[in-house]
Regions:
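N-terminal Rossmann-like NAD(P)+-binding subdomain of aldehyde/semialdehyde dehydrogenases
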Residues: 1-119
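Short acidic-hydrophobic, aromatic-tinged amphipathic segments that line or gate anion-handling sites
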Residues: 1-7, 178-183, 303-308
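A glycine- and small/hydrophobic-rich beta-loop-beta segment
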Residues: 258, 266-341
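C-terminal core of ALDH-fold dehydrogenases
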Residues: 318-426
Length: 426
């Protein structure tokens, strides 16, 4: 980890740079896979599963027998943990339900919104170095609450053609309708365009590597919506001298073990804490089974000391982290001033891991500074709001002349006439 003390503002942009994930050079490769899936459907996906995931499959769909078997393979303690997490995620997201109100903007003119679920959604759950069954809950639970009629899930199988049982169990608990053995670009293409087995969906959710990210970008240009721009995962700890270095180091490492391109940052007002955290990270790193991954991630991570909390908050808002842990004496007051972050964890007993798994908030969040403009996944991500308006005779008399005047000045005579012909009948 790099130690930085009292950087000049002119250095901030360089200091806050993320590990680069360049998808531009991948587009030709990714486009070729997408085109194969569009033209050859299941056959193309099966061939690519054999090529990329080394899985010789005869069909893509997960069977009822596989789902029943998965339930017997998951440890009872893990089942209980998944059910608890599902309950909290459900409680938090159910509280986000939209209640539209009719508004009379002026006499005779009534406007309102209605929330409608996206009918078909696709969830992508990576395989990779860890089975992300928690992401199944984070995406499927709000989709179910929203009322999505078809919830499709794609996830890569192992070399034996099996999906991790915890992923299958979580999918059943959360209410996923159909599950398919497909990973990477071919999974995204399958959900974007449909195959003989995989239905076409209207919006695709879920994390993935640079190939998945590039695929989502390409299919979203004109064919299907996606959740948000994605990049490597990241955490920032914002701390003062009261922070526990053991906790801070543990939080930084919990992010670093995600992947070699993840980033962990400490911004603090205390040089003593900076040094203590460095030593504690080195100590805890030696104990991690995923030490090699975390070690590579830490190469792009930084421990930064600034002159005061004012500057720490300003630097934090400039960084706009995916996850922000505030471990200061006055963390509630500090939190009030945070305007750019995906999800914020307050106080010494609120690790990022809580939001990753079971507190109830969603862990599908904007990365790479997109927290300045994007929200994380919520119930709103799975719905559309349709606007309605009803104009009665009194309303047409009230707003008709204004519409005519505005349309005439924009030289849109047909727009004006649509009002004029109605006014003549009132």
């Amino acid at each position: 980890m790099k130690l930085i003390n009292n950087p000049d503002r002119s250095q901030w942009a360089e200091i806050l740079k993320r590990p680069v994930m360049n998808t531009e050079n991948l587009f030709d490769t990714v486009r070729g896979i997408i085109d194969r899936v569009k033209s050859d459907g299941d056959r193309a996906v099966l061939e690519m599963e054999a090529k990329f995931d080394k899985a010789e499959l005869t069909s893509l769909a997960v069977t009822e027998a596989e789902l029943k078997e998965a339930e017997t393979l998951v440890d009872e303690k893990l089942k209980a943990a998944i059910r608890l997490a599902k309950q909290n995620i459900e409680t938090f997201h159910a509280a986000q339900r939209f209640e539209g109100k009719k508004v009379e903007t002026m006499p005779g003119v009534t406007c309102w919104q209605k929330a409608v679920a996206i009918e078909k959604v696709g969830l992508y759950i990576p395989g990779g170095t860890a089975p992300l069954f928690s992401t199944v809950l984070m995406l499927a639970v709000p989709a179910k609450i929203a009322g999505c009629k078809e919830i499709v899930l794609c996830t890569p199988p192992d070399k034996e053609g099996r999906v991790h049982p915890a992923i299958l169990f979580a999918a059943q608990v959360a209410g996923v309708n159909r599950i398919f053995k497909a990973g990477g670009v071919q999974a995204i293409a399958s959900m974007a365009y449909g195959t003989e087995s995989v239905p076409k969906v209207y919006k695709i959710f879920g994390p993935g590597n640079q190939y998945v990210t590039a695929a989502k970008q390409l299919v979203s240009l004109r064919d299907v919506a996606i959740d948000m721009p994605a990049g490597p995962s990241e955490v920032e700890v914002l701390a003062d001298e009261t922070a526990n270095p053991v906790f801070v180091a543990a939080d930084l490492l919990s992010q670093a073990e995600h992947g070699v391109d993840s980033q962990a940052m400490l911004i603090t007002t205390s040089e003593d804490l900076q040094q203590a955290v460095k030593e504690e990270v080195e100590r805890q790193l030696e104990l991690l089974p995923r030490k090699e991954i975390a070690e590579k991630s830490l190469a792009s991570s930084k421990l930064i000391v600034v002159k005061d909390m004012e500057e720490a908050i300003e630097l934090t808002n400039e960084y706009a982290p995916e996850h922000l842990i505030v471990e200061t004496a006055d963390y509630m007051q500090v939190a009030e001033r945070v305007v750019n972050a995906g999800s914020v964890f307050l106080g010494s007993l609120s690790p990022e891991s809580a939001g990753d798994y079971a507190s109830g908030t969603n862990h599908t969040l904007p990365t790479n500074g997109y927290a300045k403009a994007y929200s994380g996944v919520s119930l709103d991500s799975f719905i559309r709001k349709i606007t309605f308006q009803e104009i009665r005779p009194e309303g047409m008399k009230n707003i008709g002349p204004a519409i005519e005047e505005m349309a005439a000045n924009e030289h849109l005579d047909a727009h004006k006439n649509a009002v004029t012909v109605r006014l003549k009948t009132i």
